């Protein structure tokens, strides 16, 4: 529970349920319809954090597109240091103004994303991960940045 995200204690408690749905229902349906295609998981903000977390919990995803992921959340860095990704490629993206937020917890995203990238470089190498800095803040060009994350993984 992190009250910087929400005062609702249920926020974040259903990530395992979501991953189980993806593993047991969504991906089998996709494979039955389109064949054994590789899967990339991605998300924005808390969704980006979910994508990083999910890649540590299962080997289902070949790639991750984590755009403005909430890596500043309490205990994330400890988790990331102790749980390696199973993905073959990871795209990280952050707006260059995000680490200058007034909220000190959210401003920690700069050092936290740099640490996340360092960990991924150790795990995957520079060829298999990238940290792309974009102009603007957290809410600038979300769709374009997400698209670039998926394209990077597909082109990888």
Regions found by a protein language model. Give the residues of each.
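Short, well-ordered alpha-helices that flank and scaffold nucleotide-derived cofactor binding pockets
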Residues: 32, 56, 122, 151
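Short coil/turn segments at beta-strand junctions that form active-site/ligand-binding loops
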Residues: 37-38, 88
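Conserved hydrolase catalytic core segment
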Residues: 53-62
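A short, hydrophobic beta-strand element of the alpha/beta-hydrolase
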Residues: 65-67
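The feature captures the conserved acid-bearing segment of alpha/beta-hydrolase catalytic domains
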Residues: 71-145
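Catalytic active-site module of serine/aspartate enzymes centered on a nucleophile-bearing elbow/loop
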Residues: 145-156
């Amino acid at each position: 529970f992190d009250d910087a995200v929400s005062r609702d204690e249920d926020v974040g408690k259903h990530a395992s349920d979501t991953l189980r749905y993806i593993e047991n229902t969504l991906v089998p349906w996709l494979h039955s319809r389109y064949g054994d295609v590789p899967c990339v998981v991605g998300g924005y903000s808390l969704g980006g954090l979910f994508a990083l977390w999910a890649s540590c919990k299962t080997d289902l995803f070949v790639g991750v597109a984590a755009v403005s992921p909430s890596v500043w959340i309490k205990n994330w860095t400890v988790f990331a240091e102790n749980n390696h990704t199973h993905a073959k490629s990871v795209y990280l993206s952050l707006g260059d103004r995000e680490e200058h937020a007034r909220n000190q917890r959210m401003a920690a995203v700069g050092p936290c994303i740099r640490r996340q990238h360092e960990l991924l470089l150790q795990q995957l190498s520079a060829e298999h991960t990238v940290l792309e800095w974009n102009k603007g803040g957290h809410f600038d060009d979300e769709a374009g940045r997400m698209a670039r994350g998926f394209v990077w993984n597909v082109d990888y």
